[in-house]
């Protein structure tokens, strides 16, 4: 089992202590996991960060990989710290006042702009606004295809984020986007619960793994502190 998107109390909104995370992943038999705390820029300003030096020391103490979920809305500049083993790119900003098709298009254009300008390993929760707002992503297949082709050509992974299952009944991205990624040649994915509390670790992952069995995916994971691809049962 795998969970490559977890938040601890290093995140501004995280409620899970490191010891509790370790205890829960061991209890659930999760073999591959990474703590990916928020480091985010909006409107040219650093709005969410954490004490990276302390975080690195803590990860070294527990012999865990160093991860972060980085985010930028494409405004101004964004400078992210070096030294992470794993970087999730998760775009969170969207304009809920736009009509559903325009909301999705604006979000996807922002995502593509940022992807082309920052270093990352995995794109997190594509179609994220669908979790909270009315967003018509099917009306924007052209942009979704551009994003997925970029991932394939640049050997980046697509995350299937299970948190959406508990907000609107579907993972992020929805399965039709995952199928589109596969049809375009994408073969590397990863799965994350996006847990901010220890009791949410691993939530929905077995359900998503069952759905993904129809594809011949490899899963981006960590072995110690090294990024690897694995086959999951």
Swiss-Prot record:
GO MF term list: histidinol-phosphatase activity
Which PANTHER family does the UniProt record give? HISTIDINOL PHOSPHATASE-RELATED, HISTIDINOL-PHOSPHATASE
> Hey, which family's this protein in?
Belongs to the PHP hydrolase family. HisK subfamily.
- What sort of enzyme, by top EC class, is this? hydrolase
Identify the gene encoding this protein.
hisK
Q: Signal sequence span per UniProt? A: none
Which reaction does this enzyme catalyse, per its entry? L-histidinol phosphate + H2O = L-histidinol + phosphate
Its UniProt pathway annotation is:
Amino-acid biosynthesis; L-histidine biosynthesis; L-histidine from 5-phospho-alpha-D-ribose 1-diphosphate: step 8/9
UniProt-recorded name of the protein: Probable histidinol-phosphatase
Q: To which species is this protein native?
A: Thermotoga maritima (strain ATCC 43589 / DSM 3109 / JCM 10099 / NBRC 100826 / MSB8)
**Keyword set for this entry?**
Amino-acid biosynthesis, Histidine biosynthesis, Hydrolase
Q: Which SUPFAM superfamilies match?
A: PHP domain-like
UniProt-listed Enzyme Commission number(s): 3.1.3.15
